[in-house]
Design a protein with these regions (language model features):
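Extended ligand-binding clefts on enzyme/binding-domain cores
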Residues: 224-225, 231-352, 357-363, 414-433, ...
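Short, surface-exposed recognition loops and adjoining beta-strand edges that mediate ligand/DNA contacts
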Residues: 33-35, 62-79, 153-161, 201, ...
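Membrane-proximal, proline-rich intrinsically disordered regions
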Residues: 22-68, 297, 311-314, 399, ...
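Conserved, well-structured interaction surfaces
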Residues: 83-150, 179, 194-200, 352-359, ...
C-alpha cells in the first residue's frame, strides 16, 4: 500500500525542485535540490523557482486544464478512448481515476515546496525576502484553490459548509483531515492579503506580484458571491496601470505570445521550446497541425453549441481561435464520427511550435468580467453592461452588436449576458463548468459528441454528486482521517 501523498512529501526530494535542477528545459523556474539547506537568499530564491516548477509539472498543468475543460459544454469528444479524458467528459468518476490521483499528488507537492520557503522566512527580514515569501504564499493558495474547486462543492451550495480539502500550511509529517470549503476559502484569503502586502516588486507575468494576488482574490470573492470584494480587487488590478487589453488584431494571436510580452496577461505558466511535450501537451487533443497531421491527436473539438454562439457575430475576433477542418478537394466539413472537426488553437504555436504554449491563469479580460458579474448580481446593471461591452468592442464588435440595459438580445437577464460573454471569452481556458455550477446552472450538451449513452444530449445538474471528483483511492487507503465524497 502506498503511503499518503501529503505524508510522504516530507520524506522525499522535492519533486518540482529536483526536476528543475536537473533539466534546463524547466527554466526560468530553475532551482536547487530539496536536500540543499535553505540558508542564504540565493538558496531561498532557488527553492522559489522550484515552487514555480511545481505548477509546471506535466501532471499538474495538463490535468488542471483537462479536468477544467472536459466537464463543460465547449468541447465535443468525438469517440471512445481509454484516456482518462473519457471519464472527465462523461462524468463517470471513480476513486482510482488517474487524473485526480496525479493532480492531487502534484498539487500537494507544489504546496509542500512553497511551505518549505514560507517556513524559512520571517516577516520583515528584508524586502527581497518578503517578496519571496509573498510569492510562495500565492503559489500555495493557487494550488489550494484548484484543489478545492475539484474536490469540494461550489461555495454557493451550503454557504461553504460542505467538506472541502485538507489545508496544508506546514511541512509536518501528518495525516490531515478535510477542512470545509469555507475554511479553505478563508485560509486562502488571509494568505493572499498577506502575500499582497509582502510583494513590492512588479515582476512580469511569469511570476507572482501583488496584482497577481489581487486577481486570485477577485476570483475567490466572486466564487463566494461576496460581490463588493470581487469588484474591489478587480479594480485594484485594472487600475494598477500594469496591464492593458490587447487590440483586436493582435488579440487574434494572443496565445502564441510569450506571457511576459503580452500586456494583458497577469499570470501564466511559462513554457519554452525545450518544454514541448508533443503528444502529451495540453492542446494535443484539441489540435493537429493541418499540414503535417503529426502534432497531436486532434480528437476533441469545439462544440456545435459554442460554434452556434460564435456564429451569431461573424466578425467576432474570437473566431480566430477555432479552425474548421475541410476536405481539401470537396471543401466539405470533416468529421470524426458524428462530430465536426473544429480545432481549437489556444494551446498552440508559441515560438512557431505546434503544441507549445504558456497556459494563461489570469488575464485582464477576466477582471472586467468578474466586475461585470458582481455588478450584475448587485443590480448595477449599467456598470455590468459597460464592462461586457468593453470586452465585445475589443473582439471587434460594434453598434447593434453591443448590449444596452434595454436590449439584452433575448438573453433574459444581465447575469445571462455576462455568463455568455465569459463563455465566449474564456472557452477552453478552464472556467466554464465552474461558472455554471457556482451559479446553480446545469451543464447542457445539445450537440453531437461521445457523451455516453446519448451522443446528442447530455445534462448535468449543479447538485449532481459527479460535479466534483472522488478523493483519490490511494489517499483514502493511507489516511484514515479523510472522508470520501459521495
Amino acid at each position: 500500500m502506498k503511503k499518503n501523498t501529503i505524508r510522504r512529501l516530507i520524506l522525499i526530494i522535492s519533486l518540482v525542485a529536483s526536476i528543475s535542477a536537473c533539466k534546463k528545459d524547466l527554466k526560468p523556474y530553475d532551482s536547487k535540490l530539496d536536500s540543499d539547506a535553505l540558508i542564504t537568499q540565493g538558496d531561498l530564491q532557488a527553492a522559489t523557482y522550484g515552487a514555480y516548477a511545481g505548477i509546471k509539472a506535466p501532471n499538474y498543468t495538463l490535468r488542471l486544464f483537462w479536468m477544467s475543460i472536459y466537464p463543460g459544454d465547449n468541447a465535443a469528444l468525438s469517440g471512445a478512448t481509454t484516456d482518462p479524458i473519457y471519464n472527465e467528459y462523461t462524468y463517470t468518476h471513480f476513486p482510482a481515476e488517474a487524473s485526480t490521483t496525479n493532480f492531487w499528488h502534484d498539487a500537494y507537492a507544489a504546496i509542500y515546496s512553497a511551505n518549505r520557503v514560507i517556513e524559512k522566512i520571517k516577516d520583515g527580514e528584508s524586502p527581497a525576502l518578503d517578496q519571496l515569501k509573498g510569492e510562495n504564499l500565492f503559489l500555495r493558495d493557487l494550488s489550494h484553490f484548484f484543489l478545492v474547486r475539484f474536490f469540494g462543492r461550489p461555495y454557493s451550495q451550503g454557504a461553504g459548509n460542505n467538506i472541502g480539502i485538507p489545508i496544508k500550511d506546514n511541512t509536518k509529517n501528518d495525516l490531515p483531515s478535510r477542512n470545509t470549503v469555507k475554511e479553505v476559502y478563508d485560509f486562502m484569503i488571509t494568505d493572499l492579503l498577506k502575500a499582497s502586502s509582502l510583494m513590492t516588486v512588479s515582476k512580469d507575468s511569469r511570476f507572482a506580484s501583488k496584482e497577481v494576488a489581487y486577481a486570485l482574490l477577485s476570483r475567490i470573492y466572486l466564487y463566494e458571491e461576496k460581490n463588493d470584494s470581487a469588484i474591489f480587487y478587480a479594480n485594484k488590478v485594472i487600475n494598477s496601470g500594469r496591464y492593458s487589453l490587447m487590440a483586436t488584431e493582435p488579440y487574434k494571436k494572443y496565445f502564441t505570445l510569450h506571457p511576459e510580452d503580452n500586456p494583458e496577461t497577469i499570470f501564466a505558466i511559462r513554457f519554452i521550446p525545450q518544454d514541448n511535450q508533443y503528444y502529451s501537451a495540453i492542446g494535443n487533443q484539441f489540435y493537429n497541425d493541418p499540414v503535417t497531421h503529426a502534432t497531436g491527436y486532434g480528437e476533441t473539438y469545439a462544440s456545435l453549441s459554442l460554434i452556434r454562439l460564435l456564429n451569431q457575430y461573424p466578425d467576432d475576433a474570437r473566431h480566430s481561435f477555432i479552425e474548421l477542418q475541410r476536405d481539401p478537394v470537396t471543401g466539405d466539413t470533416l468529421k470524426r464520427g458524428n462530430v465536426p472537426k473544429f480545432f481549437m488553437n489556444k494551446f498552440n504555436w508559441q515560438d512557431g511550435i505546434a503544441n507549445l504554449s504558456s497556459p494563461v491563469i489570469f488575464r485582464l479580460a477576466e477582471m472586467y468580467l468578474n466586475r461585470a458579474e458582481a455588478n450584475a448580481k448587485l443590480g448595477n446593471n449599467q456598470a455590468a453592461i459597460d464592462d461586457v461591452n468593453i470586452i465585445r468592442k475589443r473582439a471587434g464588435l460594434s453598434g447593434s452588436e453591443l448590449y444596452t440595459v434595454d436590449d439584452l438580445k433575448g438573453r433574459g437577464s444581465i447575469l445571462n449576458v455576462v455568463l455568455e460573454e465569459r463563455r465566449l471569452e474564456f472557452f477552453f481556458e478552464g472556467q466554464r463548468p465552474f461558472d455554471l455550477y457556482r451559479n446553480n446552472l446545469p451543464m447542457i450538451r445539445d450537440y453531437p459528441g461521445f457523451h455516453g449513452t446519448d451522443h446528442y444530449n447530455f445534462t448535468v445538474e449543479p447538485t449532481d454528486p459527479q460535479v466534483i471528483w472522488f478523493i483519490p483511492e490511494r489517499e483514502m487507503n493511507a489516511n484514515p482521517n479523510l472522508i470520501q465524497n459521495p
